[in-house]
Amino acid sequence: MTDKEVKAPKIEFPVVDYPIKVISDTGVGRKDLILEIVRKHATINDQRVDERSSSTGKYTTIQLHIVATDQDQLYNINSELRATGFVHMVL
């Protein structure tokens, strides 16, 4: 790698307050399913779960904070959420 190449930032695990934002279609029970999926992989700070609807009501954003232990954990959360079919993005 040359000096001009940019290195990807590395996360030092564990991260006690790691934010995750999930953008999905709006629907009954979807927030509960999203939280259930994330809870299979991580501890959620229930005090820091926020839900917002888009201006049209078509999409919902759920922001939550977890204890992140490693990159595999984050990958598994992302993969399982995306496999639902109603989650569009996990940031």
UniProtKB/Swiss-Prot annotation:
An example of a Gene Ontology cellular component annotation for this protein is: cytosol
PANTHER family in the record:
UPF0250 PROTEIN YBED
Protein name per its UniProtKB record = UPF0250 protein PFLU_5418
Q: Which cysteines are joined by disulfide bonds?
A: none
Q: Which NCBIfam families match?
A: PRK00341.1 (NF001486)
What family does the entry list? Belongs to the UPF0250 family.
Which source organism does the UniProt entry give? Pseudomonas fluorescens (strain SBW25)
UniProt cross-references to SUPFAM superfamilies, sorted A to Z: YbeD/HP0495-like (SSF117991)
